[in-house]
Swiss-Prot record:
Known role: Cofactor for the uncoating of clathrin-coated vesicles (CCVs) by Hsp70-type chaperones (SSA1/2/3 and SSB1/2). Coat disassembly is important for fusion of vesicles with target membranes and for recycling components of clathrin coats to the cytoplasm for further rounds of vesicle formation. Binds to assembled clathrin and recruits the ATP-activated chaperone to CCVs. Stimulates the ATPase activity of the clathrin-associated Hsp70-type chaperone SSA1, which then disrupts clathrin-clathrin interactions, leading to release of the clathrin coat.
A GO term from the CC aspect: cytosol
Biased composition (Low complexity): 76-92
Region (CB3): 303-362
Span of domain J: 603-668
Alphabetical GO biological process terms: clathrin coat disassembly; clathrin-dependent endocytosis; endoplasmic reticulum inheritance
Additional notes on this entry: Present with 768 molecules/cell in log phase SD medium.
Residue ranges of the region described as CB2: 238-302
Keywords: Cytoplasm, Endoplasmic reticulum, Membrane, Phosphoprotein, Repeat, TPR repeat
Single GO term (MF): clathrin binding
Protein name: Auxilin-like clathrin uncoating factor SWA2
Membrane topology: Peripheral membrane protein
Length: 668
């Protein structure tokens, strides 16, 4: 058996010679057909289904075991004509054909590769392009993720992109933020510790030359100003002059540069409006922190310590006068810093609302809008009160009270008007409460009572208003049958040198109820049988009237007794009507108002059903109308005694039931 690779080795050795002979010797006419068939056979023999169209180079030519290598190479076995021709071909021709096949094979391979690969490369791109584009997509995705993480920390997209380009990652930026926060916390702790050391050692104010100390000074002034504003709103009479003095001193402080202190690492500012005690340095730092606020002077009264004078231009800020070293400080948080106030140490103590030694009335400021609203509502209420519309007048007086600032003296007049209206409609308990509120607004000093109340029209002093409030207070106690408290109120008026007839009569009424006098038995008068002429009767009457003077009190007592006797005669009849009206429901104001038409026969009273009295508001309106019809001052004089007694009983019964109804329904 011959070597199957003999022809291949021979073709490789004779490659150069075959190429030369090809160039010099022309090919025969049938060589292209042979060559083409050979190429086709090789292509059919070597091509496998697994070959990919995307391969860049053709696979090497490997002989198939089915090919008969004993025959001339590259000649199809199924063609008898070509095999016979190949068998008759000389060796030189075989070599030449072999060389032509190799040349054509190489060219065909390149051509086949180019024609097959080109469409795929145009559609999919080359392998190098795929690798390059994949890397770019991966880099862009990582960049977008990192920028998104940076933006989650509050950065804008431009800042996050700039940080990413500068190699500042999310973790690194987070570390930077943590380090800055730690530095700020450490700085705040150091400032607090240094401030405590300065207060304990009694150091003076310090101002640094750097920008941080200037910022601290500005912040200090802002905080102190805020404190003064808060205290001014709480103590307006005392803060007017102090705020002006503080502004002057504030301007002076800004003109000086305070010296530095070496033992303060942060050189922070000492508060310029606080007096600090010279305390010995404490050994325990925790104790310093706990007693930090105790070293500062607050609103409470304490003894001022001795403060060392400073040689700096601002020494006057922290100087406390010698005359007040042993005196209690009042409201030291509002200390004055001007030099003029240092000589007058007690000017602030005389700025209270009612000072005994002052001749002027320190008033609470009131705006023009508040004052005009007060006068307008007061005028409406007075007009309604004169017309007998006490309910609406009470509402107008309450509006006038609500327009005034708290603790303003005009509130006394407004409350006095409200009390007068409440007496007319039977709200005695409420009138007593308002009288207590009004009495609390009076000056504590008797000397101030002679002063006129500011913005009062017409002008009235405290002495003019006080007895009116007290008399109405006593009358309210009488209507509530608290005769003991009413008597005490009348006696207090008498102690203040108020001896009005109304006061004295009220006192006697209360005394008669508390200690009723014994009833004297009248002696029976014997009738004389002797007859006298009219002339003698007239003479006797004139003589008796001239000889036996009868006092006015005795005649009034006689009339009272006659009235009491008449009432006593009608008592049973009136009691029966009132009892049938109550029907055992004295506390049920809805029942009383719904059945009131059977008693109020002398006035135009509209029937009210129980369905109309479901809402508490409707109950209140109906009650006000009923009280206005039955009030003793609203009853006409021409009314019969029986109806007067019925009206009095209705008024008192409704007043008691209304007080209980207000408590049950939480009505003011």
């Amino acid at each position: 058996m011959s070597d199957p690779f003999a022809h291949l080795l021979t073709s490789l050795k004779n490659k150069d010679s075959a190429s030369a002979s090809k160039e010099t010797t022309p090919q025969s006419s049938n060589s292209p057909s042979i060559t083409g068939s050979a190429v086709a056979d090789v292509a059919r023999t070597d091509k496998s289904p697994n070959d990919s169209l995307h391969s860049i180079s053709a696979p090497p030519l490997i002989p198939s075991p089915k090919v008969d290598f004993s025959a001339p190479p590259l000649v199809p076995t199924n063609s008898t004509t070509k095999s016979n021709t190949a068998n008759n071909t000389p060796p030189s021709a075989l070599a030449n054909t072999d060389d032509d096949f190799n040349q054509l094979f190489g060219m065909g391979t390149v051509t086949t590769t180019d024609t097959i690969q080109k469409p795929d490369e145009d559609y999919y791109g080359s392998k190098e392009d795929h690798l390059y584009n994949g890397d770019d997509a991966l880099v862009d995705e990582v960049k977008d993720m990192e920028i998104a993480r940076l933006m989650s920390l509050g950065l804008s997209i431009e800042e996050a992109t700039e940080f990413y380009e500068n190699d500042v990652t999310y973790e690194r930026y987070l570390e930077i933020l943590k380090s800055k926060q730690k530095e700020r916390n450490d700085l705040a702790i150091r400032k607090k510790e240094s401030g405590i050391k300065m207060e304990k050692s009694g150091l003076s104010n310090i101002v640094g030359t750097d920008s941080n100390n200037l910022f601290s000074m500005a912040t200090d002034f802002f905080n102190k100003g805020k404190k003064l504003v808060d205290q001014w709103t709480s103590f307006p009479p005392e803060a007017n002059d102090r705020l002006n003095n503080y502004s002057k001193t504030h301007d002076k402080v800004e003109d000086y540069d305070l010296p530095q202190v070496n033992d303060s690492p942060n050189r922070i500012l000492f508060e310029d409006n606080e007096v600090v005690e010279n305390l010995p340095p404490a050994d325990n730092p925790d104790q310093d922190l706990l007693t930090d606020f105790e070293t500062k002077i607050d609103i409470t009264k304490r003894t001022a310590p001795d403060v060392s004078h400073s040689s700096s231009p601002t020494s006057g800020i922290l100087i406390e006068e010698n005359s007040r070293r042993n005196e209690p400080l009042i409201e030291d948080s509002l200390l004055d810093f001007s030099e003029g106030n240092l000589t007058n140490s007690k000017s602030n103590e005389d700025s209270t609302l009612f000072n005994e030694n002052s001749n002027t009335d320190s008033t609470i400021p009131i705006s023009d809008i508040e004052l005009s609203g007060y006068n307008e509502f007061k005028a409406k209420g007075t007009s309604l009160f004169k017309n007998g519309d006490y309910i609406n007048s009470l509402q107008e007086y309450e509006k006038s009270l609500n327009t005034l600032p708290l603790n303003h003296p005009l509130r006394i007049i407004a409350l006095s008007n409200i009390i007068a209206s409440q007496l007319k409609i039977g709200e005695y308990s409420k009138s007593i409460e308002n009288s207590s509120m009004a009495l609390e607004l009076f000056p504590s000093s008797k000397a101030k009572w002679k002063n006129k109340i500011s913005n009062s029209d017409p002008e009235r002093s405290f002495n003019d208003i006080w007895p009116k409030i007290m008399i109405r207070r006593a009358e309210s106690f009488e209507h509530l049958e608290s005769f003991k408290k009413a008597l005490e109120t009348y006696q207090e008026l008498i102690k203040k040198n108020f001896f009005d007839d109304k006061i004295m009569q009220g006192k006697r009424r209360c005394q008669d109820f508390i200690n009723p006098p014994p009833v004297k038995k009248s002696m029976p008068v014997k009738k004389k049988t002797t007859t006298t002429s009219p002339a003698t009767k007239k003479q006797n009457l004139t003589a008796s009237s001239s000889n036996s003077p009868i006092s006015v009190d005795s005649t009034s007592e006689i009339k009272k007794r006659e009235l009491e006797n008449a009432k006593l005669a009608l008592y049973d009849k009136v009691f029966e009507k009132i009892s049938s009206w109550k029907d055992g429901k004295d506390d049920d104001i809805r029942h009383l108002l719904a059945n009131l038409s059977s008693l109020l026969t002398w006035c135009n009273w509209k029937d009210v059903s129980m369905q109309d009295l479901v809402m508490p508001k409707r109950v209140k309106i109906t009650y006000m109308k009923a009280v206005a019809k039955t009030h003793p001052d609203k009853i006409p004089e021409s009314l019969s005694l029986e109806n007067k007694m019925i009206a009095e009983n209705i008024f008192s019964t409704l007043s008691i039931a209304w007080d209980k109804f207000k408590l049950q329904n939480d009505i003011n």
